[in-house]
Amino acid sequence: FPYTTLFRSTGIVTTTDNGGSTGRIRQEQGGIAWGDLRNCLNQIIIEPSTASALFEYRFTGEGELSGHNLGNLMLKALEDMHIRPIEAINLIRELLKVKSHIIPMSEEPVHLAASLGSGSSIVGEVSIDNLTELPQSLFLVPMVKAAQEAIQALEQAEVILLGPGSFMTSIMPPLLLPELATALRNSKAKVIFIDNLGVEIGAASQLSLADRIQKINEIVGAPVIDGAIIPYREQSAVDLSAISPIKILAKRLNADDISYRHDRTLLAQAIDELVGELDYE
């Protein structure tokens, strides 16, 4: 059986967003960042429904609600009712009939920060996304505890996927939590990096595949990546000697309607193929 259909999938999601509707809610009400969690739930809905359309509804007009996403407000309301973020997500999962599990990297409010070459620091994903130079390092403010369920998911995983997503603001933040870095470092699972289909906007665009893999390994404290899935058109640009002995699988992965978005079926097939090759070695 294919790995992607045989096993239960669990997503560990970054909670450092401070832009858009999420940023406004955090600035005015505090709490964790719900935007990426909401978006992940929406992306894995198999059967669209009135409930899923309601969850993704975004207010328009000129009032205070303009630009706010109803799903963000629903999750924030559950948080204000003193419901654990993970339990709040599970309630929405049941409403949307989502089978996959979604876990925040932490259940405590946290922001992403960066140290710059000038010696100064900036705080916030929005500021980091707007950088034109690569930061010297990334760190969390304040340092928080990882969600226990996230640690357990890594410890029990048979395959761990990193990406796709914004490298500095989506993939890296969970790895900055010592408990998650340790769990990944000690894991016996096959670890696969999934590259983006398009070039990132901002400083992250300066990083090659080898650079990104090296930064992950540095943060985790060990060479943890076993394989990488990349767009077939980029395979000629990859310096294989720089990432050896990592197994590279280059495939057509883009959706027909949006060139920079992965097609679910094609990506699942690529994951199955690469896991099979890694298991055979």
Residue ranges with predicted function:
Residues 108, 183, 197-199, 258, ...:
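Non-transmembrane, aqueous-exposed alpha-helical and coiled segments at domain scale
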